[in-house]
Amino acid sequence: MPGINGAGPSNFFWQWRTDGEPVTEREHDSSRSASSANSPELPPPASPAESGRQRLLRSSALSRQTREWLEATPARVQGATPPAEARQSPEAQQAERIVQELVRGGADLNNVRTMLRNVMDNNAVAFSRVERDILLQHFPNMPMTGISSDSVLANELRQRLRQTVRQQRIQSSTPARLADSSSGSSQRSLIGRSTMLMTPGRSSSSSAAASRTSVDRHPQGLDLESARLASAARHNHSANQTNEALRRLTQEGVDMERLRTSLGRYIMSLEPLPPDLRRALESVGINPFIPEELSLVDHPVLNFSAALNRMLASRQTTTNSPELPPLASSAESGRRRLLRSPPLLSGQREWIEQSMRQEAEPQSSRLNRAVRLAVMPPQNENEDNVAYAIRLRRLNPGADVSRVVASFITDPAARQQVVNDIRAALDIAPQFSQLRTISKADAESEELGFRDAADHPDNATSCLFGEELSLSNPDQQVIGLAVNPTDKPQPYSQEVNKALTFMDMKKLAQYLADKPEHPLNRQRLDAKNIAKYAFKIVP
């Protein structure tokens, strides 16, 4: 028979040659020379290990699995490999077909290889839509249960991907510096930045004196060059998909400000998207549904949300065309003239400003509003109730949380839930001062890839929840959130903590107030254990 595949004790596939298979060239030459000389020779003495295997094979007490494994061992040791047609198992043939499908679909094979390893290691992943669709045909349970490290097909696929990627590198003549120019833009896409940190790149020197906590940036066994190339390819692929989706939505006349507001509320508070916006996103290839089993950071809607925020921010800075204000009423004009009058007392000025704010409010809102705060700017469109209440509390020191909430939520029945969410967020925020630190110099290394918005305005690191990060921004608490926890005395280690995703801890606190789950692995995350996951970035 042409070949048999059997599972050995470790669940790996082994191959062997049966009696009906063709002999190797060396065996054929030795038999031909022996017959031509007409002098039969005794076979060479068997090694002790081979003799032991033969004695075991003659034993009747062997199980079928052990007997098959013993028969496979001599062929593997002696190098008597059968032809390619007989050597390939069904799983190997299926793995080769998967690779061919990925190549035809334009997938990044190096990224698939890296992400497949992460799936088998139960780490966060980031496949493109094409890669995900192809793999789901062969691993349908991947989103729910992952892929077992004992899967024969998965191991065959990893081996085949490794061989194909190596061949592509040999054939490619693209200089590595082309990848260097784009690999520095870490976290430009929310998906790309997560996976880049899971496949750390080359280490760059940084000042040891500037680091307050030593960082292990040299884990063993990393393919540094392939990590940089994979990071650049993932960033370019994800950015192209997102830009195309934004272009099509703009051409279709979608209200991008409304889309940004709805996406922000959906991500932060899980408020459902309006049906028309959901259909618009699906029409450009973005499925907004976030299943429970999928890590939040892995979802493409986060990458799209960050790109949408950048696009609208650039529009606001470039479109500074002056517009005439609407005509004011006579009463409002009189109050404005009074405000420009220098002899006003502070109490008079505050009363006039408050009356102008009340005039601008709808009548129903004024009737239902229970209290007024001394400082109360309007709520932004992309600002949820928790974020707005925290901002009001900061602008009005000493104001009770319940009073702050009652100042802008008209329905008394809806106030208590917001109060509970705010208090949960306020419990997390003070933990920032207790976090372990990573210096800015270490954070800006190629492995971690942080880019401060003050130093890199065109290529800044974006928060997981949208805005660009900067240590000089007084309204932000910049942290790196790890996938795996470690106790407080231990410094950050890329090998132990795995991926490090940068974000604003204030935004994270708002997210955890509504849903206390780690955005990278869905584990519980609250004020009690956040110090095991988060690292404070310091100058």
From Swiss-Prot:
InterPro entries: E3_ubiquit_lig_AvrPtoB, HopAB_BAK-bd, HopAB_BAK-bd_sf, HopAB_E3_ubiquit_lig_sf, HopAB_PID
Segments of skewed composition (Basic and acidic residues): 18-31
Induction record: Transcriptionally induced by HrpL.
Sorted UniProt keywords: Hypersensitive response elicitation, Plasmid, Secreted, Virulence
GO CC aspect terms: extracellular region
Location in the cell: Secreted
Primary site of residence: secreted
Annotated spans, Disordered: 1-93, 163-220, 230-249, 315-336
One GO term of the biological process aspect: symbiont-mediated perturbation of host programmed cell death
Annotated Low complexity bias: 181-194
Family that this chain belongs to: Belongs to the HopAB family.
Free-text function comment from the UniProt entry: Effector protein that plays different roles depending on the species and plant cultivars that interact with the pathogen. Acts as a virulence determinant by enhancing the development of disease symptoms and bacterial growth. Acts as an avirulence factor by eliciting hypersensitive response (HR) and plant resistance.
Protein name in the entry: Effector protein hopAB1
Top-level taxonomy: Bacteria, Pseudomonadati, Pseudomonadota, Gammaproteobacteria, Pseudomonadales
